Design a protein with these regions (language model features):
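Conserved, single-site charged/polar hotspot
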Residues: 1-277
Length: 277
């Protein structure tokens, strides 16, 4: 994340939460209903800043803002009360090692210009995944999750991602810390490893990727002396919105909604007021 960092700046985040903390203290958690009290637009610039780099095009950041708002409303719906939602937001930001010193103006502008906009499927909110760089094609939700409930996440071409300087990443791991026999068992239609055999045991591809610290589960395995080389394509899980691909579209004058329509062809951008949540 290419944003200025200053030690001990967690207080910046807390300043945004003070009005809601007082409400909880004096009125109790149950009385602080999310859908009535919590101003999502106020917290969104912080959330978006933790998800996408500041040097991206404004329309790309606006697309990410719509995604962030959609996912935030889902959290609110699931957790029901303010304390749980704020706690989860803070955990998410800390998990990215993100401590914001100054909110850059483009994040606030992106949130303001997309106020109330969310992504929906058949008029309902759905989880909206995103990643930094695809392997040239985003993944099918139905394939990844083996469920029709995620069929709204369609695989689309994103060949422009291959032009990114971060498209290819090599990770070298000493053979001694790996299973004696390791081989790829299956891939999905976008080329991401779905199953890997490790000494006869079947491991899920994305779990293996995270455990090994790989940038992507779209990888090949090569022997390199006493090490094994994992050559990874793309960055992230490959589902949904490719930030790099979307940014290249923005450079060609695509707006936020056009970008989202491309990466989520089954979904619609609506105002949250018209969505049952």
């Amino acid at each position: 994340m290419k944003i200025s960092f200053v030690p001990g700046t967690t207080g910046i985040f807390c300043l945004f939460l003070i009005p809601y903390m007082f409400s909880i203290i004096f009125n109790g958690v149950d009385s602080t209903l999310i859908n009535k009290k919590f101003d999502t637009e106020m917290i969104l610039p912080i959330v978006v800043a933790s998800q996408i780099e500041e040097n991206y095009e404004l329309e790309t950041i606006k697309a990410q803002s719509i995604i962030a708002r959609s996912n935030l409303y889902i959290k609110m719906k699931e957790q029901k009360n303010l304390a749980d939602t704020l706690s989860q937001i803070w955990k998410d930001i800390k998990s990215r090692s993100f401590y914001l010193a100054v909110i850059q103006p483009q994040y606030e502008k992106a949130v303001e210009e997309t106020e109330g906009k969310v992504l929906t499927w058949n008029g309902e909110l759905k989880a909206v995944p995103y990643h930094q760089i695809s392997a040239g094609q985003t993944r099918s939700g139905e394939e990844v999750f083996h469920s029709e409930d995620e069929a709204y996440l369609k695989s689309v071409q994103s060949n422009v991602d291959k032009k990114s300087k971060d498209f290819l990443n090599s990770v070298y791991i000493n053979k001694n810390v790996l299973p004696e026999r390791i081989e790829i068992k299956s891939r999905d239609s976008a080329g991401y490893v779905t199953e890997i055999l490790a000494d006869g045991k079947v491991l899920e591809g994305e779990a293996f990727r995270k455990g090994m610290g790989l940038t992507s589960s779209n990888f090949t395995i090569q022997k390199s002396g006493k090490e094994i080389r994992f050559l990874c394509r793309g960055k992230g899980h490959g589902l949904g919105f490719s930030q790099y691909g979307g940014n290249e579209m923005a450079k060609e004058s695509a707006n936020a909604e056009e970008i989202l329509q491309y990466y989520f062809p089954e979904m619609d951008v609506l105002n949250i007021k018209s969505v049952n949540c």
